[in-house]
Amino acid sequence: MNFEGLDPGLAEFSPAMHSTLDPVLDAHLNPSLLQNVELDPEGVALEALPVQESVHIMEGVYSELHSVVAEVGVPVSVSHFDLHEEMLWVGSHGGHATSFFGPALERYSSFQVNGGDDIRQIQSLENGILFLTKNNLKYMARGGLIIFDYLLDENEDMHSVLLTDNSTLLVGGLQNHVLEIDLNTVQETQKYAVETPGVTIMRQTNRFFFCGHTSGKVSLRDLRSFKVEHEFDAFSGSLSDFDVHGNLLAACGFSSRLTGLACDRFLKVYDLRMMRAITPLQVHVDPAFLRFIPTYTSRLAIISQSGQCQFCEPTGLANPADIFHVNPVGPLLMTFDVSASKQALAFGDSEGCVHLWTDSPEPSFNPYSRETEFALPCLVDSLPPLDWSQDLLPLSLIPVPLTTDALLSDWPAANSAPAPRRAPPVDAEILRTMKKVGFIGYAPNPRTRLRNQIPYRLKESDHEFDNFSQVTESPTGREEEPLHTVSKKYRKVTIKYSKLGLEDFDFKHYNKTLFAGLEPHIPNAYCNCMIQVLYFLEPVRCLIQNHLCQKEFCLACELGFLFHMLDLSRGDPCQGSNFLRAFRTIPEASALGLILADSDEASGKGSLARLIQRWNRFILTQLHQDMQELEVPQAYRGAGGSFCSSGDSIIGQLFSCEMENCSLCRCGSETVRASSTLLFTLSYPEDKTGKNYDFAQVLKRSICLEQNTQAWCDNCEKYQPTIQTRNIRHLPDILVINCEVNSSKEADFWRLQAEVAFKIAVKKYGGEMKSKEFALADRKELRSPEGFLCSSIEELKNVWLPFSIRMKMTKNKGLDVCNWADEHELSSLGAPSQWGPARAEEELGVYVYDLMATVVHILDSRTGGSLVAHIKVGETYHQRKEGVTHQQWYLFNDFLIEPIDKYEAVQFDMNWKVPAILYYVKRNLNSRYNLNIKNPIEASVLLAEASLARKQRKTHTTFIPLMLNEMPQVGDLVGLDAEFVTLNEEEAELRSDGTKSTIKPSQMSVARITCVRGQGPNEGIPFIDDYISTQEQVVDYLTQYSGIKPGDLDAKISSKHLTTLKSTYLKLRFLIDIGVKFVGHGLQKDFRVINLMVPKDQVLDTVYLFHMPRKRMISLRFLAWYFLDLKIQGETHDSIEDARTALQLYRKYLELSKNGTEPESFHKVLKGLYEKGRKMDWKVPEPESQTSPKNAAVFSVLAL
């Protein structure tokens, strides 16, 4: 090839000048490359780009024609020549797309495709452009209008698309499958399994699909079935790029070396006729991209990321003279593409610049391009200036375009109607105490407001429209009007209920992470934030889940069940209904005032800060007691059983701090008593001079407490003034601190210390309060122990709490405490350290505690306030949920979860954000404990157990327990149905327009759970039919729908097989853990009320199996009549009948759909079902005899 006019020095190639390309620099090998590139908008100036006024292009020789900036400082992630118009498309790492028209690269359009993810591939179609990001496929017009936006699963990590025909698209990524999407219906039609995961490059010929894998392999797949026909193991490390032309396949990649992966300078070439490799081609650059450019011959273009480009024949030898250099503005080339006409090459670099190389002065991108549509030019050249300083200037001088349409000002008054002010919501106390006579309700006056006075601004309108700022309440209870606003993410979140309940509420809007939130509508759910804190303590999470005892209302067991649900959830909120149910039964909780009435919780009466601090002390004590009662070495077998006790527990090992209390009488008599505590309460100094105190000083004063009090002296035999001191013997692994900011005195102390600390920081770092940046030397001093760099001194406002503290036990039973950051700064400045060598710290009794969580009270007079938590989530949680290893602070506000800056966790504006609880953990805490979770639930929970009911007879048994040879296996079918009773009625209001608005849904409790065998000779026979004993007051038994009658749940008079909720819960948990598949009708609601999290692949719900999109759900009774010719649920519901019917419907579904292989024929059956339902108004015809099928043949297990 002729390369005349190029610099001869480019032909002199020195391997020493070109280091081995790091494999992590390649975007196909390491898709997270672009996420680690620092974006510097000021790094590239437009004036610095070399733009030549005239470019001399030699025919047949590629030379640079133009260079333009797509987005300053943002790396180019993909480039693509439009296949229909003379345009070049460029996607950036910031999710922005830009198009350039013609070889002059005139900017045509520019718009944002995705707010956070980079654009990974672009595909042009006739009517628009397809953009692929991590888990989103967006089809947009060339001007930027969205045609469709298809959201993939959050767990997907897509990298490549391939257009197989005009309406079918293949999408591949780092998963073990490739999706086929129909562009006409915008639906996923097929999911092809891939044996080797990681499909990042796809090509197509008239014979095969070619898939390039991150493992270094290239697979050839059938065009119809997508099955592997052949596979080339190209590279031992990873694949960088490959291309196919004719009967040749060329690939470049990385090979494994002793020091890791290295770029392989041998291109692998394969003959597709013989399906074998031919002589590899050695090149003189580090290949990162390659393309066939078949103009005259099948030559290859090989590109390195440093900008070197070499042309060679795939079956010949590479000549070092055939190398030219692209001059990128950034250090790396990120993309490369060739136009359809092979006349133009496009390169994108890491600084956002695009370089166009052509082989002719006037190239065309496509052989036959259609005309591009441009925007209409402005029809008005100029308008006369108007002097707005003239007050009498008539507005009619402003020219407006002529229009034939009616103007809004011409709207007739007859078609207008006044909008009256909405009626205020009825007071919750009135609704609670209201009695009804017919349709009229009456209630006593709650005396909460003056006569004939209604607030102008209604609370409900504030929730529905975010037009008014939330005004906070003073933390000290003062009556003045506060002036500070509450940030939106800290406000109390509420669930908006519709006629579909929670199904159409978008929880993803509040939580974009994969961590699970907690629902707030359950009574006493104010402790949600503390449940999250305990869950993200890794030793607590693991060790609590290993606990299982025989106590019915054990908080440790219920907390372990809740933690298990939080582990399984992938971003969906959970509810702690069973845990809070057990919590309400603890007498100590009621005695401490921890059980709130619904009206008190809704109105925010009482101090939530004091409440959560009492709850914190109670839960640690209760868990300590529950964990002391060790279970016998067998599975849970009912309500009875024996315990063996122990003096210590896992909670005690984690939280307990051994103390020594010394009482010294004035007579000289000294009494020493040992004790332990699970948490500490801050005790603030009485100093009113405004002295500066470190947090460590206040903490030490609170731990090593000294006070004068009257106490009994055995020597004096009377009460005497004594000096009581408290010394510490052993430091806990987790340091829990109650802040006790309950009055203006403590609030003023925090505010004063934060102001003093901020002034010291300003003075120390030589900046002013208005400065936003520091000098380099000062920025180094602001580096925290976790590597965080504070970019602005404004972030240190309202910060007094340190992120780390160091504690040391002295030889004279004393305790030294200091802020770790302060000591770190002193040592970095060369000052001597008082703690000794770091590697011998623990041997010397020195420990570092890192802040893990802060629980704060949000003061808001409009909503009554709320409790939120800032939690530092560790690497193990991110690895399990997000698939990444890093630490991050998050805000947990019930079901709202949002990542935050670490300084936000310690910024306490005492006007609305008051600290309540602090959690510090020892550094490297997880390495001190065995964190393996062993499922404590065994198969014996399914065996026969005694009933709690005293009057039950064996002749009335409605189920046969499983035998040992019938134990379920993975994939077995189990029919399930549950019946419920109502504990609290729904709270709703009727609006002025006649619509009903649900304020609070009814609280349901499970009353009966039935499981029937799904296969085998005893198919359809139940093996669980448990009635759940309840101690709570039942408002409505719902006998018409549940079949539950008063007395069925009372152990004294019930004749049913009565058991505890925990016993039946363990049976279902075992079935879920073993991997059975549940068949039922409306299982989503059943599992929600039972408080179980079941993987979606283990749920076969006939509600959705016999459902068409955007159509109504069909009842089990109608489905049974239509498909099975059965008439069920005649007088009441029976869970055995419903579970068996759901199993039969599932068998019918498999029969009609041919095991799911013929969806089209089954779709026709559903059409007929919906047509029949509309004709009959979805009502089953009444039988000739009013006797129900159940009365005609009563089911008896013993008769089978």
From Swiss-Prot:
Record text on subunit structure and interactions: Forms a heterotrimer with an asymmetric homodimer of the regulatory subunit PAN3 to form the poly(A)-nuclease (PAN) deadenylation complex. Interacts with PAN3 isoform 1/Pan3L and isoform 3/Pan3S. Interacts with ZFP36.
Cystine residue pairs: none
Activity control: Positively regulated by the regulatory subunit PAN3.
Entry-linked CDD domains: PAN2_exo, Peptidase_C19P
Domain commentary: Contains a pseudo-UCH domain. This ubiquitin C-terminal hydrolase (UCH)-like or ubiquitin specific protease (USP)-like domain is predicted to be catalytically inactive because it lacks the active site catalytic triad characteristic of thiol proteases, with residues at the equivalent structural positions that are incompatible with catalysis, and it cannot bind ubiquitin. It functions as a structural scaffold for intra- and intermolecular interactions in the complex. The linker, or PAN3 interaction domain (PID), between the WD40 repeats and the pseudo-UCH domain mediates interaction with PAN3.
GO cellular-component term (any): P-body
Example GO biological process: mRNA processing
Family: Belongs to the peptidase C19 family. PAN2 subfamily.
Name the record gives this protein: PAN2-PAN3 deadenylation complex catalytic subunit Pan2
Start and end residues of each Exonuclease domain: 974-1146
Protein residues bound to a divalent metal cation: D977, E979, D1086, D1138
Cell location: Cytoplasm, P-body; Nucleus
Cited function: Catalytic subunit of the poly(A)-nuclease (PAN) deadenylation complex, one of two cytoplasmic mRNA deadenylases involved in general and miRNA-mediated mRNA turnover. PAN specifically shortens poly(A) tails of RNA and the activity is stimulated by poly(A)-binding protein (PABP). PAN deadenylation is followed by rapid degradation of the shortened mRNA tails by the CCR4-NOT complex.
Chief location bin: cytoplasm
Xref: SUPFAM superfamilies: Cysteine proteinases (SSF54001), Ribonuclease H-like (SSF53098), WD40 repeat-like (SSF50978)
EC number in record: 3.1.13.4
Xref: InterPro entries: Exonuclease_RNaseT/DNA_pol3, PAN2, PAN2-PAN3_catalytic_subunit, PAN2_N, PAN2_UCH_dom, Papain-like_cys_pep_sf, RNaseH-like_sf, RNaseH_sf
Residues in WD repeats: 153-193, 195-231, 244-280, 328-367
Enzyme class per UniProt: hydrolase
